[in-house]
UniProtKB/Swiss-Prot annotation:
The gene is rpmA. This is Large ribosomal subunit protein bL27. Pfam families: Ribosomal_L27. It comes from Phocaeicola vulgatus (strain ATCC 8482 / DSM 1447 / JCM 5826 / CCUG 4940 / NBRC 14291 / NCTC 11154) (Bacteroides vulgatus). InterPro entries: Ribosomal_bL27, Ribosomal_bL27_CS. The lineage of its organism: Bacteria, Pseudomonadati, Bacteroidota, Bacteroidia, Bacteroidales. Belongs to the bacterial ribosomal protein bL27 family.
Length: 87
């Protein structure tokens, strides 16, 4: 016989909601100024040219163009936006 009752809902429900982090616009894709490119905790990706960084380390585009990911010295990954050529 069980000496404790099967404890159900009162012991459940401690999991936090997912934060939806990660790359939102990938390399080679077009983006507009203000679009979020990467949501991250800390600087997993560093801001390159035409990229702004929010206070939660979110990277966003400052100009319209194409997203470009680069690997620099010491495997430091950065994100840039190559401006779109206006015709």
């Amino acid at each position: 016989m069980a000496h404790k009752k099967g404890v159900g809902s009162s012991k459940n429900g401690r999991e936090s909601a997912s934060k939806r982090l990660g790359v939102k616009i990938f390399g080679g894709q077009a983006c507009k100024a203000g679009n979020i490119i990467v949501r991250q905790r800390g600087t997993e990706f560093h801001p390159g040219e035409n990229i702004g960084m929010g206070r939660d380390h979110t990277l966003f585009a400052l100009v319209d163009g194409t997203v470009c990911f680069k690997v620099g010295r010491n495997d430091r990954r950065s994100v840039s936006v190559v401006p779109a050529v206006e015709a």
